[in-house]
């Protein structure tokens, strides 16, 4: 099972979080993108833009942050953090 933890922070305080599970046979990239899309829908947010720095952090650490600059719409938090909790190999 693949699980992605999505958290929103403001002033270093956790505002809201959710965990998205994916049992499909998709590739890891598809699972990440689909889970992020589901989390954004759940939290009523637009999907963030993946910058080169964000992609590199995610590839190395299985964790990354999307700042307000990563969103087209104005957001009411400082950053969104995503982290892979569990993966199928």
Each model region followed by its residue ranges:
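Short, extreme N-terminal segment that most often corresponds to the first beta-strand
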Residues: 1-21
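Short, flexible N-terminal segments of the mature chain
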Residues: 16-42
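Acidic, low-complexity intrinsically disordered segments
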Residues: 35-89
